[in-house]
Amino acid sequence: MSLIASFTKKSKLNATIKQTAQARKSEGSTADGLFKAAYQGYAEVLHDDPLRADALYNWGFALLHQAKTKTGDEAVRLYQDAIDKFAFCMLINPNYLGAAINGGVAYMDLARLEKVKPDDKLYEMAKIQFEKANAIQAGTASYNLACIYGLRGDKDACLKALENARDKVTLPEAVEILNDPDLDIVKGQDWFVEFMEALNKKNEADEAENKADVASKAPEKKWKLVEKNADSEETITEQEAPAEDNPAEEAK
């Protein structure tokens, strides 16, 4: 951050602190308006600070993974702390993709830990985070959304999200999808079976096409043309092999 930008942000912060003090002395709608303006001021001060955003994201990422190793209240505290760090990161940089996705993951893990129902607020918050991720980069969190819709038994939304993930090439491997407990409710339904069968056929066709493409680009065999005379054998050049790999003059 340049000195000018730093000075500008400092001035903005001081003005916002004064606005907060004024809000505390006010009442009713006047106070609410001043508080709202102050919050916007704080957000503007924090906005576009890449280093701070990266630090918050990685802090949240560490908390998320530590939470996965804990149980009970300690895990809840760590998940909530991770969620707060990701939210703060996105306050600084609203387009921080990793914070959006992992914020949703943290909400889902917390929902599982607390064994809440699929329509609980925690799952809804996860859904909001995944939708933010998709708005930043289309399809990146479509599979995560499919998992939420799968838990809720929402066929149409789940299928649409799976198709979007497929089209954006963000689906996990088929075996991971089939083993995902979030999709247990829908796995036996005809539409899901048809989707997986079509996916497997597409993968097989893509694999066959890739193999054919590799084979067509493989280097042709080469052979050495050797000219023989009574006294010596001299290698003249290295040439591309003819269509029929049976050169009459090839040295034996």
Model-predicted segments: where are they?
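Terminal, low-structured helical/coil segments at or just beyond the last alpha-helical repeat
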Residues: 1-8, 173-252
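TPR/TPR-like alpha-solenoid helical repeat scaffolds
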Residues: 61-62, 100-109, 147-152, 172-198
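Structural signature of tandem alpha-helical TPR/SEL1-like repeats
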Residues: 28-41, 68-88, 112-131, 154-161
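Alpha-solenoid repeat scaffolds
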Residues: 26, 30, 52, 69-73, ...
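Sterile Alpha Motif
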Residues: 139-169
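Amphipathic alpha-helical repeat scaffolds of TPR domains
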Residues: 2-26, 49-69, 95-113, 139-147
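Structural marker of alpha-solenoid helical repeat scaffolds
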Residues: 48, 92, 134-136, 168
